[in-house]
Curated annotation (Swiss-Prot):
Its main location: cytoplasm. GO terms for biological process: ribosomal small subunit biogenesis; rRNA processing. It comes from Rippkaea orientalis (strain PCC 8801 / RF-1) (Cyanothece sp. (strain PCC 8801)). An accessory protein needed during the final step in the assembly of 30S ribosomal subunit, possibly for assembly of the head region. Essential for efficient processing of 16S rRNA. May be needed both before and after RbfA during the maturation of 16S rRNA. It has affinity for free ribosomal 30S subunits but not for 70S ribosomes. This is Ribosome maturation factor RimM. Binds ribosomal protein uS19. GO terms for molecular function: ribosome binding. The PRC barrel domain binds ribosomal protein uS19. Keywords: Chaperone, Cytoplasm, Ribosome biogenesis, rRNA processing. It is found in: Cytoplasm.
Length: 186
């Protein structure tokens, strides 16, 4: 598997931890077993040119920080661990957990086009998903939506059924019913 489309990013190495080669990983996954269950994972270099197989020995969650501390069999000391800063931890996309109806993988939502359900107007494109009390879709607004320069404007849209009633992965679109003023808050 060397195609970037065949991988799922589960986290990014942000630092070495301790002297025995442990790594701090900022999670981009909602599935703790990806960091806690031993087995094969893959590392992608920051330049995205190389992917190497590694063996996860153990991992533990650091409460309140969205971080895991992991140990890879191939990394013996802090010096080796420090060379992996900004590497990405991957799993094959075939390892995606099955989701219930109404649940989505974040990677499936990125780059979907967002439309106003009542007017049909194209609003923008999903650029990220942020976790807060509710998940929030980060949407880059279209420049065509107003006379203002909105080329860099982004809005956060609560990812709840009342506001986002339609997610159509097949047609790569999301329809929203934003409350008055939501799109002007950026």
């Amino acid at each position: 598997m060397d195609n970037s489309e065949s991988w799922l990013e589960i986290g990014r190495i942000v630092a070495a931890q301790g002297l025995k080669g442990e790594l701090k990983v900022m999670s981009s996954s909602d599935f703790p077993e990806r960091f806690e269950k031993p087995g094969t994972r893959w590392l992608q270099s920051p330049d995205r040119l190389s992917i190497q197989e590694v063996e996860l020995v153990r991992g533990r969650y650091v409460p309140g920080k969205n971080l895991y501390v992991i140990k890879l069999a191939e990394i013996a000391d802090r010096t080796q661990a420090e060379t992996l800063r900004d590497y990405t931890l991957l799993v094959p996309s075939s390892d995606r957990p099955q989701l219930n109806e109404g649940e989505y993988h974040v990677s499936d939502l990125i780059n979907l086009t967002v439309y106003h359900q009542q007017t049909g107007e194209e609003i923008g494109v999903v650029t990220d998903m942020l976790s807060a009390g509710n998940d929030l879709l980060e949407v880059q607004l279209n420049t065509l939506n107003s006379s203002e320069n909105t080329s860099s404007k982004k809005v956060l849209i609560p990812f709840v059924y009342e506001i986002v009633p339609v997610v159509d992965l097949v047609n790569k679109r999301i329809e929203i019913n934003p409350p008055v003023g939501l799109l002007e808050l950026s």
